[in-house]
Amino acid sequence: CIRDRYCVHGPRVHEFLQEMNREVLSRYDVMTVGETSGVTIEEAQKYAGEDRNELNMVFQFEHVEGQGSDHGKWTTEKYDFQEFKKVMIKWQEELAGKAWNSLFLGNHDQPRSVSRFGNDSDEYREISAKMLATCIHMMQGTPYVYQGEELGMTNCPFNTLDNFRDLESINAFHELTEQGKMTEEDMMAAIGYKGRDNARTPM
């Protein structure tokens, strides 16, 4: 992919990261993490390899980007637990003793983790939040807790398009409904489930 070759994983990116580490970062007591969307295990081992002197850890997205539909990320299907488990185990095993990983389930671009990976009903919200936190904190890597995650925050019940502020959701709604690829009802459900506004509501 041209994006990966020239923007994300450019031909001299490792050379430049090593120079930055050598000339600047190594002189201070700092920790570095690289947001590496689309990174492979092999690339992650280069970016955060213990003997590479580039970054301390990678922030990879395979476990949260893996599920989609014919319309990109816009779906209301629950995440496939077996696939999620397979991806998490792969990263744990392949980076063990070689590189360091960031552990997360949510951020400003993802729906709330309890709504996505757990059960956000009144009966199971708290148990789901605790189970997900235990999962993340018991693995090898550095856990990241996104604001509100420690409270078990769930997706917000947006019920009209006017409630949304994120242009990604608004534009996708218009594009997919006007092209007849999704009904307005299905699209409202999809952006309500996967939209970024869910993670941007006040705590």
Which stretches of residues belong to each language-model region?
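Active-site and adjacent substrate-binding regions of carbohydrate-active enzymes
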Residues: R3-M203
